[in-house]
Structure formats: structure tokens, C-alpha cells
Amino acid sequence: MKTFLKNHSYDMVTMLLNQIAIALFGFTLVLAAMKINNDVLRNVTSVFSILFYLVLLYIKAWDIGFKDKISVEQGKKSNAPLRGALISLCANAINYLFAVFIFLRAILPNVEFFDSVGSVAQAIAIFAQGMYTGILVNQIGGAPLNAYWISYFIIPLPAILVCGVAYYFGLHDVKHTGFFHKNQYPESDREPKRKD
């Protein structure tokens, strides 16, 4: 595990920074939509922000998988197709830490420590996951989704799933569209050239 963290700490930090940047972007768009009191626009901007975030993660995880492909083929690295999901899970560890504090606040509301730490964690989580804010303010059962502790455990799942799939595709050099991989070499440049 130590080697894994050493080899992929940069990737985890990059994914976390992508999350923070897109959270700011999404939060700003949602606030603008809420200012004009337009629920449809709020939901659409939130979905757009989430998709944009997932595309960034897809590109990053695919590149990691593609870079690992050679090491796996040469036997220098083990074939671990779930490595992308694990990298994303580690990058989302802070989100799950917030979720645990929010959960403890929900089940132990009379314990002052968990109430205060859970409140702070919820405020930070709402901001750190700003791309989901437009959806989380929708009411279900008389309360917004961000009032339910389970929401904070569900939010990181799309990122983990996308990174897992993208890493697997990168590891096997599977491309579904050229949009995501414009900077990759063409197939003709990937094969070693023979010298005559």
C-alpha cells in the first residue's frame, strides 16, 4: 500500500484539485441560477458541472491506465484493473471523512462534539462538492437532499466508478471517442519502426 500511495499520490492530489476547481465552478453557477430563482436552470447547471468533472476524471484515469499498460505488459507492475477505482477512492478519502462526521452527527445528535464537528463537516462538504449543490437542494420527503447523511456517502461513487472504468479502458488501450484523447499518438506511431 505504501508503494501504491507513493506511485499515485500525484494522481490523487490532481483528482482532488480537479474536484475543488470544479466545485467552485459548479457552486458559482448554481448560486447564479438560485439568484434568479430558476430551478430548472439550477439543476441543468449542476448536471453540467458534474459531467464536466467526470470527464476530467475520465481523461486523468485513462491516461494513468495507458501509462501503466507498458509496465503491466513487461511484468514490472501487476495487472490490477481496479487500480483506477482505488486511486479515486483514496482521492475521495476526505469526502468520506466528512460523510462519517455527518453520519455521526445524525445518529448522535445529543453529543455536542459530534454535533459541532458534523455541522462544520457538512458545511465544508457542501462547498467541496459544489458541483452537486444544485441537485442536493431539491426536496425529497420535505427536506433537501443535503439534509440526509446518506447523500454524502453516495456523492463520491460516480467519480470512483468513472475512474475505475477509464483506468481499465486506458490499461487496454480502448478508446470510444477521439474527443478525450486528442494528444495521444496515432496508431502508426505506437508500433516500433523497423530500420532497413
Annotate each predicted stretch with a short phrase.
Residues L56-D63, L145-T177:
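Transmembrane alpha-helical segments in integral membrane proteins
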Residues L56-I87, A91:
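Membrane-helix interface/capping segments
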Residues F25-N38, F101-V111, Q139-I140:
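Juxtamembrane "helix-exit" motif on the non-cytosolic side of transmembrane helices
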Residues G84-A121:
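Hydrophobic alpha-helical membrane-insertion segments
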Residues D173-D196:
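Short, highly charged, low-complexity non-transmembrane loops/tails of multi-pass membrane proteins
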Residues M1-F66:
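Transmembrane alpha-helical insertion/packing segments
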Residues F4-L17, K77-L97, N146-I150:
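Loop-to-transmembrane boundary segments
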Residues Q122-L161:
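Hydrophobic alpha-helical transmembrane segments
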